[in-house]
Regions:
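Non-ligating segments of multi-cofactor redox enzymes
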Residues: 1-144
Length: 144
């Protein structure tokens, strides 16, 4: 199963992946209209640690502690990824606390959890953060 991998040595900390993620999840076709004058709410985030920058995203663990800990059954592992059904999420945010990678975060509206869902339902089949990373620090590939 393909996953997103980040090479922190190549990450410039430009945050373009965050904008592309927010745009992809806006379901609009014009980035300016989708994001102009709005706070962005990406499902990936860039952490800046001085000279080191890296993108934090869901690893889609096969034995995910977030799935096991979800009291409402909103999180599940299906088709090789951890999926979230926000209509089932009760907003306890236990998944936020137990994710060892810090990849699940509270959604700004509704008090439910949000995370990367591998937005591959586009023409290229690659997540937007990968397609638009100007330094190729984010890749979408299969590894052992």
């Amino acid at each position: 199963m393909k996953r997103i991998y980040v090479n922190e040595k190549w990450c410039l900390g430009c945050h373009l992946c965050e904008y592309e993620c927010a745009f992809a999840n806006s379901h609009l076709t014009d980035m300016v209209k989708a994001l102009k004058g709005k706070a962005i709410h990406p499902k990936i985030r860039v952490e800046d640690g001085g000279d080191v920058h890296f993108a934090v995203n869901c690893r889609h663990c096969t034995d995910a502690v977030c799935v096991r800990s979800c009291i409402s059954g909103a999180l599940s592992f299906e088709d090789g990824m951890v999926a979230i059904d926000q209509s089932k999420c009760v907003g306890c945010l236990t998944c936020v606390l137990v994710c060892p990678f810090g990849a699940i975060m509270p959604a700004p509206e509704g008090g439910v959890a949000q995370k990367c869902m591998l937005c591959t339902d586009n023409l290229t089949g690659e997540p937007n953060c990968v397609r638009h990373c100007i330094n190729n620090a984010i890749v979408y590939e299969e590894r052992d």
